[in-house]
Regions:
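Auxiliary, metal-adjacent structural segments of Zn-dependent hydrolase domains
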Residues: 1-41, 51, 100, 104
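Hydrophobic (often cysteine-bearing) scaffold residues that line and stabilize catalytic clefts
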Residues: 9, 55, 90
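Short pre-active-site segment immediately N-terminal to the catalytic Zn-binding motif
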Residues: 42-57
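Active-site recognition of the HExxH zinc-binding catalytic motif
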Residues: 56-69
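Post-HEXXH active-site segment of zinc metalloproteases
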Residues: 67-98, 111-114, 118
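Pan-zinc metallopeptidase signature
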Residues: 125-169
């Protein structure tokens, strides 16, 4: 149960994440984190709203949880999780997953792909996504999360950016 009042966009994000099984937990984060105000745990995102700089980063972090296998996801935030996590593939998957979430939630791409994110390459990602160049799509399809256009036709289902499921098995 969230105790603070958040923007309409964040309330929409929190509702979506709750629906797919990713908990949002308000918590004061004393330690330094990669993204200010955010830390990951097993199927949850810890949020320190006083330190959170870019609310859209929550969706990106949710993408990391979503593209991680169930067996590894339960280790996130513990010493048992590999120091190699997330891999470059996980990063690519989380980026594309967050794009699909934005599409699903009907939020602007700049909500996640803000000017100070992605090593100042947010405009490059936005341009690629707007052109239908979905970097990492074969990976998300391999993970069983979505379908390419050609596979969607074969299976008579909707193609990416529509997701077949949001959380990897």
């Amino acid at each position: 149960m969230l105790t603070k009042k958040y923007s309409e966009e964040l309330e929409k994000v929190f509702s979506f994440l709750n629906e797919i099984g990713i908990a949002i937990i308000e918590k004061e984060l004393d330690e330094a984190t990669f993204l200010p105000g955010l830390s990951l745990g097993s199927n949850c995102i810890y949020i320190d709203s006083d330190k959170l700089l870019y609310p859209g980063d929550i969706l990106h972090e949710a993408g990391h949880l979503a593209v991680t296998t169930t067996s590894e996801r339960k280790l996130i935030g513990t010493q048992a999780m590999s120091s190699e996590w997330p891999t470059q593939g996980d990063e690519i998957g989380a980026i594309l997953w967050s794009y699909a979430a934005l599409y699903h939630l009907e939020l602007p791409l700049e909500f996640v792909f803000h000017p100070n994110g992605y090593k100042n390459n947010s405009d490059w990602y936005i341009s690629n996504f707007n052109s239908g160049n979905y970097i990492g799509l074969p990976l998300l399809q391999w993970m069983g999360l979505t379908l390419s256009e050609s596979q969607a036709i074969i299976e008579n289902k909707k193609a990416f950016p529509v997701m077949q499921k949001w959380i990897r098995d």
